[in-house]
């Protein structure tokens, strides 16, 4: 990952993997650029002291696309699946109001639901925002006890 440790390098690699996966609609690049802008404008750019900064978000997105590319050999992940995985990975930890470094999934979902620009980007990509939110909820860690129960309850709604 060291060779892609800058935001521009990660951005370029993500775009390359999207194109390789047959996803070349402008809305996905707009989503990527909007994410970078959001993180940086909320003080969560590369200089942010904590782990959950723009680099983490882009690295997770990159690794998600890379894993999906490897799995595409078995044809289990469809192009549509890839669009959902990309979108959920891109926003899985965005919580600008966080008081500690670990984001809270409910805050992430609230942001996704209320941010007008992001809702428009998701709409333009023909994705169901509820599926994106369910995928993000499934990143809850640890997946036990109250965390698991609360996430499953929200997913089932």
What do the PLM-derived regions correspond to, one by one?
Residues 119-157:
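Histidine/acidic-rich helix-loop-helix segments that form or flank divalent-metal centers
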Residues 60, 80-99, 108, 133-142:
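His-Asp-centered metal-binding catalytic motifs of divalent-metal-dependent phosphohydrolases/nucleases
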Residues 46-84, 113, 118:
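Alpha-helical phosphate/pyrophosphate-handling elements in metalloenzyme active cores
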Residues 52, 56, 92, 102-105:
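Histidine-centered active-site/metal-ligand motif
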Residues 39-50, 89-93:
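Glycine-/proline-rich flexible loop or hinge segments
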Residues 102-117:
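Structured all-alpha helical bundle cores of eukaryotic regulatory proteins
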Residues 28-36, 54, 58, 82-86, ...:
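Short, well-structured alpha-helical segments
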Residues 1-45:
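Non-catalytic interface/linker regions that flank or bridge core catalytic/transmembrane domains
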